[in-house]
Amino acid sequence: MTGYQQAILYLSGTWSGGKYLVRNVDRWYVDAVSDLFPTAPYFQLRSDGPSKRDYWCIKSAHIAVPALDEVRDWQGFCRGFVELQGTLDLWSHKNRKGYTVRTLRLRIYGQPDALDAVANNLPAGRKKMQICRTQNGVTYLYAYQSPAEVSAIITYLDGFPRNERIWQRWNSFL
């Protein structure tokens, strides 16, 4: 199992009815772990409610749930984690002279133990973990706003396998 697959299982997986279930709105991630579920067909499920999106799902009773201390391929794990839980965008703010500028920003969301594990393996300085209140409760984030750090992180994460749609969008910012 690659680090990339471990990240997908860690973030998109859950135990349900005695089986480990992986679901995601992007079929790419279900396809990326499908070889770990050799006898399980995967399927598309319809979501309930007008604001929800349909999602892809695969499940099996014969899969081991990954733990953070079992990760050996940290580059792959971080790539999967940031693809699933990260946002790369342009941040509008004023510089010292008062002009509005747009700077590249990478925000990575998650729970404290996983965020710390990922942040410890990224080529960037230590950041203060921020609390982010959402409609689902509380989550945490690290925000990288230095263009040099963001570029170094994206360069470090670059590799395969990866979700090409996300990387095309990210490359449009670089």
Feature locations, PLM:
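Internal intein/HINT superfamily modules and their associated LAGLIDADG
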Residues: 1-174
